[in-house]
Regions:
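Hydrophobic h-region of N-terminal signal peptides that target proteins for export
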Residues: 9-18
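Sequence context surrounding c-type heme c attachment/ligation sites in exported
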Residues: 20-79, 85-138
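Residue-level micro-sites within transmembrane alpha helices that shape
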Residues: 1-2, 13
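Sec-dependent signal peptide recognition
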Residues: 2-8
Length: 138
C-alpha cells in the first residue's frame, strides 16, 4: 500500500511539473488580431520584456515587413507583452527571434535540419506546422 501511495505521489508531482512547464497564451483580442494577421501570435512568455520592447519599437522593419500599428494599439499590445513576458536568460534572444532563445533550442534540439526545411514546415518560426493551435493555448 505504501508503495502505491509513493508511486501516486511521484506521478502527481511529475504531472504537475509538466503542466507548469506548458506555454499558454493569455487572452488578448487585439494582440491575437494584430500579431495573428501575419503569423501565430506567439505566447508572450517566449521573450523577455526587453526583447518585446525592442521588437515592438521596430515594427516598421519587422523581419523584413512593415508591421506598424497605431500608437494606441502598439502601446496596448506592448503593455500586454511586457506583463506576460518570460524572464531570465532562458527566454532572451539577442536577435529577437524566438528560435534563437535557449528555451527554443532546448525544446527542439532533437529535430534535425532536414525537418526545418521540409516544405510543410518551411522554417523554425512556423510553430503551427508541428504543434497546430496548441501553441496558441487553444
Amino acid at each position: 500500500m505504501k508503495r502505491v501511495a509513493v508511486l501516486l505521489l511521484v506521478f502527481g508531482m511529475n504531472l504537475a511539473h509538466a503542466e507548469a512547464g506548458k506555454l499558454s497564451a493569455p487572452n488578448n483580442a487585439k494582440w491575437k488580431e494584430e500579431c495573428g494577421s501575419c503569423h501565430i501570435p506567439y505566447p508572450p512568455q517566449l521573450l523577455t520584456a526587453d526583447n518585446w520592447r525592442s521588437l515592438m519599437g521596430g515594427l516598421d522593419k519587422h523581419f523584413g515587413a512593415n508591421a506598424t500599428l497605431s500608437a494606441d494599439d502598439s502601446k496596448m499590445i506592448l503593455s500586454f507583452l511586457e506583463h506576460n513576458a518570460g524572464s531570465g536568460k532562458r527566454y532572451s534572444s539577442a536577435t529577437l527571434r524566438l528560435s534563437d532563445t535557449p528555451w527554443f533550442k532546448h525544446e527542439h534540439h532533437v529535430i534535425n535540419d532536414k525537418e526545418w526545411v521540409n516544405p510543410e514546415v518551411k522554417s523554425r518560426s512556423n510553430c503551427s506546422a508541428c504543434h497546430g493551435k496548441v501553441v496558441l493555448g487553444d
